[in-house]
Amino acid sequence: MPVIETRVGTGAGQQEKRAAYGALIQTLRERHARVLGGGGEKLQARHRERGKIPVRERIDLLVDPLSPFLELSPLAAWELYGNEVPAAGIVTGIGVVAGTPCMIIANDATVKGGSFFHETVK
């Protein structure tokens, strides 16, 4: 098989772009980590005390083992409402259930008691 030669530059300009891109990726990862916490540790604990399963764990139990779940809008409502509505209070995505690809929509009750916002249904 022939070797594909790169056209990507290795100069200072390219290194600056790479560093800037790395910073953007880090910001994205931090935001995703914050969203995964839902309404926060206190509300997650209260949810568990009531015998309820957090939203992303419910999805993990629903989808086929070892199958991927593609979350579609984890940053919905980001920087709105003082960032108190992670993922607009809802988790949406595509997962495989019983061998069939399915659209999955699950409410996160730890975010504002499960209230819907404009961005939740947008």
What are these regions (language model features)?
Residues 1-122:
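Terminal-region recognition feature
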